Amino acid sequence: MTAPKPVVLCILDGWGLRAEREANAVALADTPTFDRLMATCPNATLVTHGPDVGLPRGQMGNSEVGHTNIGAGRVVAMDLGAIDLAIEEGSFPQNPALRDFIAKVKANGGTAHLMGVVSDGGVHGHIQHLISAVEVLAGEGIPVVIHAITDGRDVAPTSAGEFVGQLVRVLPEGARIGTVIGRYWAMDRDKRWDRVKRASDAMLHATGEHAPDAEAAVAAALARGETDEFIAPTVVGDYAGARDGDGFFCLNFRADRAREILAGLGQPGFDAYETGTRPDWSAFLGMVDYSKEHDRFMTAAYPKPVIRNTLGEWVASHGLRQFRIAETEKYPHVTFFLNGGREAPETGEDRYMANSPKVATYDLQPEMSAPDVSDHLVEAIGAGYDLIVVNYANPDMVGHTGDLKAAMAAVEEVDRGLGRAVEAVTTAGGAMIVTADHGNCETMVDPETGGPHTAHTTNPVPVILVNGPAGARLHAGRLADLAPTLLQLMQLPQPEEMTGRSLIDA
């Protein structure tokens, strides 16, 4: 029997399953295609959080973690757990890259600028990592300025006051908060350079709103109607900006939302916006590698391990063609993260990235660029590729806004695209796995507070086999099992590095 062609992996980003219908955008939306597939196709559920995806127990998954595990075909130990362990066992203060940073800043008589998300969401960073770094640097007698990035997305929308207060209470002598900035400005990933400029101007040049202290900055923002994610860049107290000889340390460990701000702060020749005169940094450090381009001007405390024989690499090694498609909000996920942290495409790997709409928040345009993604997906299905990976961003990106009606509209748009994909795959004689990388929009109200729920969830996600082998059944598993499943459908052997197991029971 010949292998189906193409084999499609359709990732409905942020589409989780929850039995209760209340505030559940997936259940409340009109989804005839998804409902039909669940009723007629082999299906099961996948775990997307905790140790099953290389995270600490109870820690919700996210798109970086999800796509890394999917592409690797094995459970990948993620940065959060590795850094937590280093702090817990006491090796963090002796990290070689951190020691080098300390030596250079000391030699230049500089201040250490620490930027990181101030929450315990654990998706992009963790407040405890920031606190630990402050303790180490202040303990070395280095003045410390913190650029506190408020979250409100991976945690409750108005919880920044608690986290900033927690940080303030443990600051050692010689450490202070210099700016408070919502992640909307400092953690963009879609080239909205006007936002990034406002964040970097506050850090570099002390321009923006002003507040006497960090807690007052959060309170003033709330009074202006800004929830944590959107707090306008605010200069705290008499902070006057960065100077030559200072060092910069980014505590966030997830690459996609750190790249732009780091480029604006330190990349030589950067010209996406006018930065003004930037300091001659004595040292520029990150928790992890952010990209090969970033490696040219900064070092990493915890370099990424090499993941060999990812799904894309293995398919390419067999001389087969593959196609990756998403809109730009999820560009890194179906490329960089799915390929194990490598930016360059594999041999025979083509890509299409639809431009995400330039709106302030995606509840204003919940369909996002899904119609464009669907058009190019259908075209690719008929173009002779062996493997296609597509990501629909809407359920996650609109779910993050906390707007239930908009999330329902997002889900319905994706369901329309899914319907087109099913028809095209069936016509072509291919097969498709429909799944998600984590949950989000199935929980739009926080059950504890009654307010909007904007974070990911630990709910299971669906996995559906469309137009698969006759008599096939699926069993429950985890994200690492998807690559082996796709390889089985493609009738390719599984590399020994992949320890996941196919979800298909013949």
From Swiss-Prot:
What's the top EC group for this one?
isomerase
Question: Which pathway does it operate in?
Answer: Carbohydrate degradation; glycolysis; pyruvate from D-glyceraldehyde 3-phosphate: step 3/5
What GO biological process terms are annotated to this protein in UniProt?
A: glucose catabolic process; glycolytic process
Q: Which InterPro entries match?
A: Alkaline_phosphatase_core_sf, BPG-indep_PGM_N, Metalloenzyme, PGAM_B_sf, Pgm_bpd_ind
Output the superkingdom of the source species: Bacteria
Q: What is its EC number?
A: 5.4.2.12
Q: Which reaction does it catalyse?
A: (2R)-2-phosphoglycerate = (2R)-3-phosphoglycerate
GO annotations of cellular component type: cytosol
CDD domains in the record: iPGM
Q: Which family does it belong to?
A: Belongs to the BPG-independent phosphoglycerate mutase family.
Can you name this protein?
A: 2,3-bisphosphoglycerate-independent phosphoglycerate mutase
Q: What organism, scientifically named, is this protein from?
A: Cereibacter sphaeroides (strain ATCC 17029 / ATH 2.4.9)
Q: What is the lineage of its organism?
A: Bacteria, Pseudomonadati, Pseudomonadota, Alphaproteobacteria, Rhodobacterales
